[in-house]
Amino acid sequence: MDKRDLEQLLSDVAGGAVTPAVALTRIQTAPTADLGFAQLDLSRGVRQGAGEVVYGAGKTAEQIAAIIKALRDAGQERILVTRLDAEKEARTSELLDNGIDLGYVPDAQLALVGDKPSPTGNGRIVVACAGTSDLPVAEEAALTAEFYGNEVDRLYDVGVAGLHRLLAHAEELAQAQVVIAIAGMEGALASVVGGLVSCPVIAVPTSVGYGASFGGVAALLAMLNSCASGVSVVNIDNGFGAAYQASLINHLSAGTHRAR
């Protein structure tokens, strides 16, 4: 049950189509669904404005398919599955024999079930990544932001090794409501972007780099120690988390954060 379902239920009660007792039962039974291996949070859409997201890593294809089916049966029409590799996606698609299209994007290891919504945010989210090797994380961020109703501008391969590439997009950066800055290696892109814009910057360190990058820890520490004001940092390779936060900011400013 999401916010629209709840509003419809209350409307039905007001119109006499549903009794208060029946409505109460529906609301009381909506919060969770017990699948044995998972307790699905079916009321998250009502509380937070966006339904539960499925984290694919560590789950079997059978578990993912069962979760998707249960969420759809509960009325959640749009479902995001993250960290879903191609082999697991193929098996999950086989198990979804009821016409559910995963909408799989292999570069981002994302599955997007349901139609992409019209943008409802106040402005645009810019997703900027330092190098082509950062694209999987960047696409996870960009597609997640679009999934939650945001207009997204992609600025790819604009790292500090060729600063002119970033400066060529000064206009897009100036018009952004939020910037997601993604970089591995030394992670300098976030600080540079933070010094160019007046909006919030969400930095995403990636695990791209040679030995002393320590799987993204070097970029993480550099971003945490940024001297640029307005830079916040999420975990290594967490494009989803950055995009979700950026979407919240963009929708808060538009007053639509409870209706995504």
Spans of features found by a protein language model:
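C-terminal binding/interaction regions
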Residues: 129, 133, 170-174, 178, ...
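Long amphipathic alpha-helical segments
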Residues: 1-85, 89-90, 94-95
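Glycine-rich oxoanion-binding loops at beta->alpha junctions
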Residues: 108-114, 151-172, 217-218, 234
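Glycine-rich phosphate-binding loop
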Residues: 168-206
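Glycine-rich phosphate/diphosphate-binding loop of Rossmann-like nucleotide-binding domains
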Residues: 121-164
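Short glycine/serine/threonine-rich phosphate/pyrophosphate-binding segments
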Residues: 62-64, 134-139, 163-164, 183-192, ...
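Short, acidic/small-residue loops that bind anionic groups at enzyme active sites
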Residues: 101-105, 193-216
